[in-house]
Amino acid sequence: MKVFKRNLNDKTIYGILMVCVMWYILHISIESNVIPSPYETIKRFIALLPGVLTMHLLASFGRIAAAIAISMLLGIPLGLWIGMNKRADALISPIVYILYPLPKIAFLPIFMILLGIGDSAKITLIVTIIIFQILIAVRDGVKEIPKELFYSVSSLGVSGMGIYSHLIMPAVMPRLISGLRISLGISISALFFAENFATTYGIGYYIMNAWTMVDYLDMFSGILGLSLLGLFLLTALDIIERKLCPWIFL
């Protein structure tokens, strides 16, 4: 927790303050309860957080965390394989290039028919977004490793899994984390949409339910919660990056 607090640095505080200033200017310009003031929203957010809001945020966080875990378990080995094997790259990369640009959200109805209306369909949707970023990032990271480094490591007596742990994984880790960082924003947006179908838990459901009830203060409290969830995940990635890739900060 102390490490997390240290990473919420002055730049993060500056960003939050600037968003609040722009939000307040928009609030006083429109002069409508459609956009409540930051103060009112934060006050309502704090009141809701110990109960209903935490429940919805945890449901959304669980879906994203499960999708990230599945994507890494599948995407990293596959990315390493096609990065190291030219034949595998020639066979799989064209398929990836065809599927990667497709809007994954369009497949949600298909996932719901095949997997049911529960969490499985929503998690699968997020996996299809994240896994391509991971696969391509790992593959490209492996390809960028100079052959001379493989020779140097081999001359030191390192072989097999040692090459992966001492050379390949450290080389691809910055790209992998960057890919995760990019895909997280898209994933949260897609999850917001997915949680409006056949579910009663999740921050996306909470926001849209508040909108249908014309409760704009609750709606913006949910939007604030969604933003803070994204901030938490991205800050966690920054912490992991500093731990696993300290050389890029020298």
Residue locations for each model-derived region?
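Periplasmic/extracellular loop-to-transmembrane helix junction in inner-membrane transport proteins
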Residues: 3-6, 29-70
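Cytoplasmic-entry segments and transmembrane alpha-helices of multi-pass inner-membrane transporters
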Residues: 77-113, 126, 137-145, 151
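C-terminal transmembrane helix and the adjacent membrane-cytosol boundary/short C-terminal tail
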Residues: 86, 174, 178, 220-250
